[in-house]
Regions:
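Conserved N-terminal beta-strand and adjoining loop/helix that marks the start
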Residues: 1-20, 41
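Low-complexity, intrinsically disordered short peptide segments enriched in small/polar/basic residues
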Residues: 2, 6, 17, 74, ...
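Short, acidic/hydrophobic/Gly-rich beta-strand patch recurrent on exposed beta strands
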Residues: 22-25
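A conserved beta-turn-beta hairpin within the catalytic core of GNAT-like acetyltransferases
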Residues: 28-31
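A short gly/proline-enriched turn/hairpin at secondary-structure junctions
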Residues: 33-36
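Unchanged
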Residues: 39-132
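Charged phosphate-binding loop/patch that engages nucleotide di/tri-phosphates or the phosphate backbone
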Residues: 126-149
Length: 149
């Protein structure tokens, strides 16, 4: 059996004026999140971020425009998803990236993964996501942006 690697990425897609892209999960309607996904064997984290971004949004981004936050979140894998991982694996390590776009743009959803998308001001987006790690990253966005200017 091919088990999932317990390493993933979260890619925060946003605009310069701090509009944040959220995707509604197909397997859990009403649950909103940023781009996320597990690392495939042989991929670097940056390659994982690029692949997930393209698969989930249709955005093809050069590696040079993705920002690696050098931040990791470790969290427990939900019990009902543990069968996807090797026996004994209980935690996942999530690596954070972001992509700043000049403006809101149309998104091409992966219909098996997401039902809908929306662009929200960062505060609303942070309140809308179901994952604590996603909310923390969104809340850090204004500070991160101010440090880059």
């Amino acid at each position: 059996m091919n088990y999932k690697i317990p390493v993933s990425v979260l890619v925060l897609v946003h605009t310069a004026d701090l509009q944040v892209l959220l995707l509604e999960r197909a397997d859990r309607p009403g649950f909103w999140q940023s781009v996320t996904g597990s690392q495939d064997a042989g991929e670097t984290l940056l390659q994982t971020a690029q692949r997930e971004l393209a698969e989930e949004t249709g955005i093809v981004a050069e590696a040079s425009i993705l920002t690696d936050w050098q931040r990791q979140n470790r969290y427990e894998i939900y019990a009902h998803w543990r069968n996807r991982y090797a026996p004994g694996v209980t935690h996942n390590t999530e690596h954070v990236f972001s992509l700043k776009l000049p403006a809101v743009q149309d998104i091409v959803l992966a219909p098996r993964e997401h039902l809908d998308c929306q662009w929200l001001p960062w505060r609303e987006a942070a309140d809308c996501v179901f994952s604590w790690s996603n909310a923390e990253v969104i809340r850090e966005l204004p500070l991160r942006m101010s440090q880059r200017t």
